[in-house]
C-alpha cells in the first residue's frame, strides 16, 4: 500500500491553504487532502457537472447568472446520486490513512467537501456555458 499512498500524495501536490497550531483536524484535512484533490480534479468536475446539466435537459444555458449559481448548488446538494458520484471522485484519491481519518468524521467532512466543490464550480460558471452537443 505504501506505493499507492506515496503516489497519491505526490500526484496531488502540496498542501493548499494555511495550517497552524490552532487549526482543527477538519481544517488540516481540508487543506492537506481536500483542496489538492479538488484542484487536481477540477476539469473532471466541470465535465461531470456539464453532463448532469445536459441529462436534465433544462434551460440552464439561458438562465441568468444568479439562477445558474442557484441551480449548481441545488443539483449538488439535492441530487443524492450525483452528490455521491462527486464524493466518489474525491474519496478515490484518499490514501488509506486519509480514508481512515475521513470515516471518523465523515459527516462534517462531507459538508466541507460539497461546500468547497459548490463554490469552486460557481466560481467557474462561465466554463459550463459550453453546450455539449448530443
Identify the function of each model-found stretch.
Residues 57-72, 124, 128-131:
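Membrane-interacting alpha-helical segments
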Residues 30-61:
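Short, well-structured hydrophobic secondary-structure segments
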Residues 1-35:
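N-terminal leader/targeting peptides and immediately adjacent processing regions
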Residues 63-113:
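Amphipathic protein-protein interaction modules
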Residues 20, 34, 71-72, 91, ...:
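Generic hydrophobic, helix-prone segments enriched in Leu/Val/Ile
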Residues 105-134:
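Long, highly charged low-complexity segments enriched in Glu/Asp and Lys/Arg with interspersed Ser/Thr
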